[in-house]
């Protein structure tokens, strides 16, 4: 995966855990070692959204310490905040230079697994539902429209929203995701990057009609699946929990009109493989196309016959769900560091 994540002008992802120090824990309340932040930085990640349903797993202190660790690792973050002043500094917006194009990033979650945010810490988490501890079905239009208006006031070239939404283990988006996407696009979002389902969901352009009759179009990736996790059909009995993709978006700014658009979309099909021996798990994030080609040319050092069948299943899943037409990234670029 590093060849792809390191070569991009800007790499973003969803950090769905806390970094609260030992003792570490898995499901249902996550806490990972601090090394994860440094590892992500070392393979080229530039920004993570920390707004998801697990960000409150260790309470406000866990949320706060997670951001401290990310700062120490020099990994930018969006979606959660330690103080009111930290939120007010940029109104929940992080502006990044992406290959000479300015992009405003915002991060939101549907909820927190029922864990409430204390009244005096309301600033700490960006959520897009009013009922974020309940049904999670009432859009906070006032909050979203206000923060997107602020993002627009910055006059960046593009606005990207990273959002935790949808239903776990569903390979299609639901009507509420589409409703939220339409609201975001109509209020200025150009790109929407979704997560939460733990399996891939469709991607593509979406056009909305505004109140004045004009239209506005944005690109939506409803979910890319698990970039790395211990989930697989064998562990959770759900297909495609080990299937993911690295999304690559090409942004182009017109020198005459100054308009910036997404001019190319592609993805890299990936498979998360546990090569553990039973004593210790060892997870690899495999480039599906590259290893299928290696196996076909006689190199079975990684792509054994057993692994090959998993690669084919992952490729079929990506093509069926994400669209075969977007699988055109080609061979991985050369990495620049060890």
Listing of model-derived features with the role each one plays in the protein:
Residues 1-338:
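Acidic, metal/ion-coordinating pockets
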């Amino acid at each position: 995966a590093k060849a792809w994540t390191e070569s991009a002008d800007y790499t973003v992802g969803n950090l769905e855990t806390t970094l609260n120090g030992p003792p570490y824990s898995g499901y249902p309340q996550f806490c990972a070692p601090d090394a994860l932040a440094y590892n992500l930085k070392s393979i080229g990640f530039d920004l993570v959204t920390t707004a998801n349903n697990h960000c409150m797993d260790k309470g406000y202190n866990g949320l706060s310490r997670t951001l401290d660790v990310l700062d120490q690792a020099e990994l930018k973050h969006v979606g959660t905040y330690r103080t009111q002043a930290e939120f007010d500094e940029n109104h929940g917006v992080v502006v990044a230079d992406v290959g000479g194009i300015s992009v405003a990033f915002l991060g939101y979650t549907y909820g927190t697994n029922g864990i409430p945010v204390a009244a005096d810490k309301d600033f700490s988490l960006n959520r897009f539902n009013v009922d974020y501890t309940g049904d999670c079905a009432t859009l906070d239009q006032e909050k979203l429209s206000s923060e997107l208006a602020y993002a627009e006031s910055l006059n960046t070239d593009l606005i990207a929203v990273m959002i935790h939404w949808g239903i776990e283990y569903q390979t299609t988006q639901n009507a509420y995701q589409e409703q939220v996407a339409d609201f975001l696009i109509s209020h200025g979002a150009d790109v929407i990057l979704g997560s939460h389902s733990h399996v891939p969901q469709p991607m593509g352009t979406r056009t909305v009609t505004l109140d004045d009759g004009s239209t506005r179009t944005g690109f939506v990736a409803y979910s890319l699946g698990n970039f790395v996790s211990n989930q697989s059909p064998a562990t959770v009995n759900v297909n495609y929990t080990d299937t993911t993709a690295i999304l690559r978006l090409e942004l182009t700014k017109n020198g005459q009109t100054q308009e910036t658009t997404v001019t190319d979309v592609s993805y890299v099909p990936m498979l998360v493989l546990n090569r553990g021996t039973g004593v210790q798990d060892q997870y690899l994030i495999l480039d599906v196309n590259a290893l299928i080609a290696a196996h076909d040319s006689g190199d079975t050092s990684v792509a054994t016959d057993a692994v090959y069948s998993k690669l084919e299943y992952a490729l079929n899943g990506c093509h069926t769900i994400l669209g075969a037409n977007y699988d055109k990234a080609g061979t991985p670029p050369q990495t620049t560091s060890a």
